Amino acid sequence: MLPYTLIQEADDRLRKRVRRTELIHSHHFSEKLGIPIYFKCENLQRTGAFKIRGALNFMTSQPREALAKGVITASAGNHAQGVAFSADLLGVPSTVFMPESTPPQKVFATRDYGAEVVLTGRNFDEAYAAAVQAQEERGALFVHPFDDPLVMAGQGTIGLEVLQELPDVANILVPIGGGGLIAGIATAIRETHPHVRIIGVETAAAPSAHYSLQKGKIVQVPVTVTLADGIAVKKPGVNTFPIIRDLVDEVVLVEEEEIALAIVALLERTKLLVEGAGAVPLAALLNRRVTDLSGKTVCVLSGGNIDVKTISVVVERGLVAAGRYLKLKVELDDLPGALARLATEIAEAKANISIITHDRRSKSLPIGKTEVLIELETRGFEHIQEVISHLQGVGYLVDVLK
């Protein structure tokens, strides 16, 4: 288990080095869910995620001579930036091994914090193996992303901050990847507030802790592509799993469309930009994955490092999940005014056209016909059915596109 004193010591070390992130009460989500909802905004942390807490606590706990040969880690995301920033802050050289498929913006961000970036391997596991080999050859310190007591203790300072600001908290929902974040937070909270309900949330695309708890031992699961790439971990840590098993009340799963909808909801209602991994606690609440909740409830928004190019895709998926986006294919007679008449009928159905594409050159079209692809803004699933029924009722052949 993780000693509570390690978290207290981490809090002392980090107090002036990391941001004490805001704990925000949300009136909108409190009314929607029927309980007081608060967000712990680690998306506003330095480097944009909680990972700096664990990385910096690990490094500042080492004797200076142990850091002389630098630090090494493997990561394709937030941990890379946390290690790079922490090393730069302490004047320590850092090397980060990243898979060759890592998006360029993450590579640039890590380099901007002063790290040497080595792109190697087809996936994280191959990059990790290369990092371990380099660490053994150089004698540098390896900073594990989650399965180290000092790293867990650093993440646990989030729990102390929540208790200091909201001592009567009743529930806390925490994302789970490798388990370092929830292990630290659970240890911090259970020490003085054993009655608090602690709930872990995973993506169904990487349910490693969920299935490990079901089996009663650590199991490795296949991981599929997910919006919550920051928690897409094949198995929990050797050190984190026993803490999750003993201190966490339950672990629930959320689906991809639910994550997308939560990202959009946070952006619209709180003006907070959160990455997929950070949105899973709210996704769990919005989709009633947790039952019988009462009292003040905290969602840990673990990070906000979402790829700019991904935002538009996520927003579109979130709008689809909320019934606020509809894409149609409609075949028209290739005659003057046909497109205008279609637009008029769409207006009659109270939908708003956002994008329209007119194609009369497709080989699949009969002579004298044209095809229109239309993207519409709608007001929910009931409105979508009204739009489709109206268009069909006036004679259009409508194909709903996914």
Swiss-Prot record:
GO terms, molecular function: L-serine ammonia-lyase activity; pyridoxal phosphate binding; threonine deaminase activity
This protein's UniProt keywords: Amino-acid biosynthesis, Branched-chain amino acid biosynthesis, Isoleucine biosynthesis, Lyase, Pyridoxal phosphate
Cofactor: pyridoxal 5'-phosphate
Pathway annotation from the record: Amino-acid biosynthesis; L-isoleucine biosynthesis; 2-oxobutanoate from L-threonine: step 1/1
EC number: 4.3.1.19, 4.3.1.17
Gene3D superfamilies: 3.30.70.260, 3.40.50.1100
Positions contributing to pyridoxal 5'-phosphate binding: N78, G178, G179, G180, L181, S302
Domain ACT: 327-402
Description of the deletion phenotype: Cells lacking this gene show undetectable threonine ammonia-lyase and serine ammonia-lyase activities. They are capable of growth in the absence of isoleucine, whereas mutants lacking both tdcB and the citramalate synthase cimA are auxotrophs for isoleucine.
Known function: Catalyzes the conversion of threonine to 2-oxobutanoate and ammonia. Functions in the threonine-dependent pathway of isoleucine biosynthesis, which is the minor pathway for isoleucine biosynthesis in G.sulfurreducens. Also displays serine ammonia-lyase activity, yielding pyruvate from L-serine.
PANTHER family hit by this protein: L-THREONINE DEHYDRATASE CATABOLIC TDCB, THREONINE DEHYDRATASE, MITOCHONDRIAL-RELATED
Assigned protein family: Belongs to the serine/threonine dehydratase family.
Protein name as catalogued: L-threonine ammonia-lyase
Organism name: Geobacter sulfurreducens (strain ATCC 51573 / DSM 12127 / PCA)
Annotated gene: tdcB
